Amino acid sequence: QRGFSGAPKYGATPTGYYLKKFVDGNCITTANNQTTTRHNWIVMRLAEVYLNYAEAMYNYYGNADEPGDFGMSANEAVNVLRNRPDIMMPEFQGNNGFEERYMRERMVELAFEGQRFWDVRRWKKGAEFFKNVDVADFKLDGNGNLILNRVTKTRQWDEKYNLYPIPQSEIQKNGNLKQNPNW
């Protein structure tokens, strides 16, 4: 049945996408097989350092081409990543649309590295990025054909989610500490 047993989707992803990034290629990944292997966890890559630098430069100077006193502009920092020999993507140029291009670049470059959650909150773009999510639902029809049904699910988002609430016990310890907005 094309690899589908009709069993519940235990451990499956609701989007239908699976992760290969940072996976040990020597692991055997077949149905009903669990594999464990030791590997180092990457906390920060040099790519993230360049992206953080680009964001800081753009936010400080308001100009993606301004190197300031640091010798590298926001565009140049992003282009270090885009010009890697194994990638060779078109360069970032100019200010027009830099923020949107940068946000996409960061999403793609750091995919599955645990940064998106924090990035979207720092940019205060949760309502734009997290309110709707596309979900893939796979089923077999009566003839054994795989049917894909894409559904957009709406989730709740409130601006207060950009900041965590401060525990009440901490506020009680320090009377000068104020709760984050709307908590």
Go through each PLM region and give its residues.
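Acidic/polar-rich alpha-helix caps and helix-coil junctions
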Residues: 1-183
